[in-house]
Amino acid sequence: SNNAIYIEGGDMTLSSSDDGIHADNTLVISDGTIDITKCYEGLEAAAISINGGAISITASDDGINAADGSSSSEGGPRMGGGPGMGENSDSNCSLTINGGTVYVNAGGDGIDSNGYIVMTGGALVVDGPTDNGNGGLDYNNYFTVTGGYLVVAGSSGMAQNISDSSVPLWQYQEALPARPLPWQIQTAM
């Protein structure tokens, strides 16, 4: 979309040679089941809000990318900077996770924001990259976690942690969400 996408329900299975779901400005997912089986980047928009739903992403580059949309698979992958040092730092870019369950398997950064990331609820599991040129988490400003369930795995070459103002990690392990996680959802083949 050249502007905004709002997903409030439904079941989607997507495969793309570029972005699975792309909005230039705003992407809001409130509910539904989204299975992106193949893509360059899974979700991309300047401002991404995940409030609910079950999302599974398999991406050759970034799984979720809060960016101004300048990256593209045309001409090959873009070259990223070090952790928090992406080439397009923009404090207006954001990823907010308030609910839902999200599973990301990414060849590039698992989740990437050229601005900030905030997680207040839901479940996020990132099966990140194995090469040292990317990381499970990549953000330029901060990543604050005040609730939810967070697991990130990937290479340590560009590893970033959540910001110091976040709640202690042990609090995330108290309980799993009642809804099935995306990798537990069976899709038609």
Protein language model features and the residues they cover:
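A composition-driven surface/loop motif
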Residues: S1-M189
